[in-house]
Amino acid sequence: MEKEQLPELKYINVNDFNINEKVIGIPVQTNEVAKYMKMFKGLCYNRIKTKCVIPYNSERMILLETPLKEQTQKLIQDNHLKTVETEVPLTIKNFNVNEIMKRYINKNIQLPSSFETVGTLAHMNLKEEQMEFKYIIGEAFLIKNYPRIQTVITKTAEISNEFRTFPLEVIAGIPNTEVTVICHGVKFVLDYAQCYWNTRLETEHIRIINQMKAGEILCDAFAGVGPFAIPAALKGVKVYANDLNPTAVKYMRINAVNNKTTIECDNMDARDYLRKIVLEKHIQPNYILMNLPATAIEFLDCIPELYLQHCMIHCYGFSPLPNAEDLKKKAFELLKGEYPITIREVRDVAPKKVMYCLSIFIESTKHLTSGNNVPEAKKTLN
């Protein structure tokens, strides 16, 4: 099978790295290679995708880290070993990503060291001083990670819209932001430029889904492309899912089909959606998910007008306070009462910004609803 062709590079010239590197080696007999490799452990030539033992005449030569360290010189002298200067032909594959970047970037610029992987896409958060060299950085990471990574992007501004997406730029590779991600055996397709996705929440998705049983009903008010909804449906949960982002809903429907499961999807405001599910369709969910940490807590204000029974609400939010006491207070204000609540830290997002999950058990909201609004509820599947 032919190796996949690296996408066209515009800023890095791979020929810049076609050099012969001068290295010092010690000729040894073939049957003594193991002995001297042990003696010079940690002192041998160690460039990536090269060998430190090469043929030499009819014997072998052990290549050493050059220039020679003081310890290496002493071992050579004490063991009366001969040294030979040779050259190792190198290409760009023999250089690590930092070495490639340093070839073009001012040494005073801090180099990026990591990225988030989403399918075949690498998401980098470059700092302001790195943006001048963004295309060099992107191509360097592409070269060293291709074909596992085929597109490199960087965020160009913070999240500022209701869909939780952010402005981004493709800085290397194929200009395509549609990716396929597999999480715990479930395949998701999404356009990363137009849909929210966070790989770091994979464990949280599974933790919540593990609480559910086949035959129960889930109402996911901010479902995105379906990271909660699809695995829940595969478990036998009846899933009603909604998102305000029409592109996310499009991909959620695609993901349901691809995973051979069924979800009832809507594209509307979350408050209107919850009213539709409970008050108009007379559906009683066992679980309501509200995963929009920036504003989800505000949507609890519609819960009192619904007729809910034995419903667990998982609502996510950000707080700078230990135990998210501010979120708890706000939740009870909007719910017009105090309910059993468990607050759990999900992850640190930034200094003094922690993501929490508020799990609120609603025994009944009947006392808060007018008689005209109380529907005949369906709690489990027929």
Curated annotation (Swiss-Prot):
Keywords: Cytoplasm, Methyltransferase, Mitochondrion, Nucleus, S-adenosyl-L-methionine, Transferase, tRNA processing. S-adenosyl-L-methionine binds at H205, D243, L244, D269, A270, N291. CDD domains: AdoMet_MTases. The keyword Nucleus applies. It comes from the Eukaryota. InterPro entries: MeTrfase_TRM5/TYW2, SAM-dependent_MTases_sf, TRM5-TYW2-like_MTfase, TRM5/TYW2-like_N, tRNA_Gua_MeTrfase_euk. It is found in: Mitochondrion matrix; Nucleus; Cytoplasm. GO terms for cellular component: cytoplasm; mitochondrial matrix; nucleus. One of its GO terms (molecular function) is tRNA (guanine(37)-N1)-methyltransferase activity. The keyword Heme does not apply. Its EC number is 2.1.1.228. Specifically methylates the N1 position of guanosine-37 in various cytoplasmic and mitochondrial tRNAs. Methylation is not dependent on the nature of the nucleoside 5' of the target nucleoside. This is the first step in the biosynthesis of wybutosine (yW), a modified base adjacent to the anticodon of tRNAs and required for accurate decoding. Belongs to the class I-like SAM-binding methyltransferase superfamily. TRM5/TYW2 family. HAMAP family: TRM5. Monomer. This is tRNA (guanine(37)-N(1))-methyltransferase. The lineage of its organism: Eukaryota, Amoebozoa, Evosea, Archamoebae, Mastigamoebida.
